[in-house]
Design a protein with these regions (language model features):
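Serine-hydrolase catalytic machinery in alpha/beta-hydrolase-like enzymes
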Residues: 52-134
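Active-site signature of alpha/beta-hydrolase-fold catalytic machinery across serine-
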Residues: 154-158
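Catalytic active-site module of serine/aspartate enzymes centered on a nucleophile-bearing elbow/loop
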Residues: 246
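A domain-start/cap signature at the N-terminus of enzymes
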Residues: 1-14, 23-53, 84
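The feature captures the conserved acid-bearing segment of alpha/beta-hydrolase catalytic domains
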Residues: 171-242
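Gly/Ala-rich beta-loop-alpha elbow adjacent to hydrolase catalytic centers
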Residues: 143-148, 152
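The conserved beta1-alpha1 loop
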Residues: 56-60, 169, 195
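A conserved short beta-strand
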Residues: 161-173
Length: 246
């Protein structure tokens, strides 16, 4: 999605899209899938012919269980005119690996908030060098879903290594996010945000803040990057609907 829209002039528009009605046309005939372990971290890669972009994202066990990664890679290949390598690295302890600081609303585990930087170091110093050795150096997009999307935005404020961010349903309701985002400008050149239109109507009082949090992030991205470099897309449904498609 980000690959297709980097040069678009209408990035700032809110978009509503019901994914189930999207028709895709295959653009890649073959895709190579590799399962690799790097520093004890399982990594699954999907590579099309003649890749032009790296896509990196944290993955959780439910994505593997539901075959979500395979479906995601297939949909990207069908929808994109550009070749790519998608690398999903396992985060079996989701909150520990991705939360940049502690928030009891996410988990009371005292380890939560201590390891997001370690995850970023793994990506920058272990995963990316392996990918570049295997496929060559190319622009790198970081993305994710839920806490993974929040981590992707956080990471893009820590390093200029990522050219773009794809954040689907980012957990920007966590305590302190707005302060962090204001104080740490994003270093990527393009940012894609999405949210389900039912997410801000949930019963959880903290999670109900997500709509305004994402709108505020989108406005901040417009200020930092320009209107044509950021998109906020509204999808039908709640937080757990159509994850691979989104």
């Amino acid at each position: 999605h980000v690959m297709q829209r980097q040069n678009s002039t209408c990035h700032s528009k809110y978009r509503m899209n019901q994914r189930k009605n999207v028709n895709y046309k295959p653009n890649h005939t073959t895709m190579q899938t590799i399962q690799q372990t790097i520093d004890s971290t399982p990594v699954r890669t999907f590579a099309t012919e003649r890749p032009e972009y790296l896509l990196i994202q944290p993955s959780a066990r439910h994505e593997l269980k539901n075959d979500g990664l395979n479906r995601e890679a297939e949909l990207i290949a069908q929808a994109s005119a550009r070749g790519f390598v998608l690398a999903a690295f396992d985060t079996c302890q989701w909150a520990r690996a991705l939360m940049p600081w502690h928030d009891d609303a996410v988990a009371v585990d005292c380890e939560v908030g201590l390891h997001a930087r370690h995850t970023l170091c793994f990506v920058l110093h272990r995963l990316l060098p392996w990918l570049e050795h295997s496929y060559g150096r190319m622009p790198c997009i970081v993305g994710g879903y839920s806490l993974g999307a929040m981590w992707a935005l956080w990471a893009a404020c820590q390093t200029n290594r990522f050219c773009a961010v794809a954040a689907a349903s980012p957990s920007l309701w966590i305590d302190g996010w707005s302060i962090y985002a204001q104080a740490n400008p994003i270093m990527a050149q393009s940012v894609y945000l999405s949210l389900g239109d039912r997410e801000e109507h949930c019963r959880n009082q903290r999670m109900r803040l997500i709509g305004d949090s994402v709108r505020r992030q989108h406005l901040l991205m417009q200020t930092q990057l320009g209107n044509h470099r950021t998109t906020l897309e509204w999808n039908h449904g709640g937080h757990f609907g159509d994850e691979p498609q989104r």
